[in-house]
Amino acid sequence: MYRIPYKKSIGEHIPAKLNSTVVDFTAAMFGNKENWGSRVYFENLYLKDGQKDKDRAIPLLGANPTSFQNYLETDNTGKAAYWNAASNIRGYKLYWHKKCDWRKDKNDKNQNVNVSKEFAPLKQGHTFVGRLRFENLSAVELGALANVLSLGDDGSSAYKLGMGKPIGMGSVHIKAKLYLQNDAYYTTLFSEAGFDSGVELGDKQKYIGIFKQYMNEMLTPASLRLYNERIEELHYIMDDSHLQDSSWAAKTAYMNINNGKDKDLANHRIPLPSIKDVVNKR
């Protein structure tokens, strides 16, 4: 069997606007390789309570069927696009929150100890604390950062951090508070309680409002509508309340090469559902 090369590279399917030379919020705040450094710094997170035993994860070397329609947008007819077509990549790589039986019985004689990796996963209910520092951010940039860290304030939106995201690990809730340097930061060393930290609790909603106002003023009505739709879909995929749905595991399961239905998805080039289709929002 011979592989036929595509006329277009993968990079040609990335929307041109994403290859723009205009500096966006992400590049401005987190740096751009050798051009300029980051103004946001992640410190270590510390576990508030202890954890003892390690678990052994299942080997993740099995083949998973895939096809190009998983990665490209479909046309107006709903048919799958091809790499030679003038179609864009579907979007960003994100993972659903899911419950997976990723543990492997250590007494299982069929497991290959050479490919099984021991690690200490975060157990449910544990809490980490830490700081994310920033410097020289404008009010709009600070609002953008605060907005990202406040997506989980609704109590049902969880983030994905660390390893094991594809198998259901790394789902965490974040509660962020904003602290700002006050006028005494460089002038006062001691306070009645001891050393003066020189910081005070800030109003993150104030800066989030500044950021949202900036977006409303800078984006065209069409771009703003598209932005709001993407934020809506982001909330859908971050929503961990779906885990209470008895059919959720089947909806978000990976394709299996031994499953006839999954083979049909690839063989017949059936486009995968959108986020809204998965959560039945349309």
Language-model segments: which ranges?
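Basic, Gly/Ser/Thr-rich N-terminal segments that form RNA-phosphate-binding interfaces in CRISPR RAMP
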Residues: 1-282
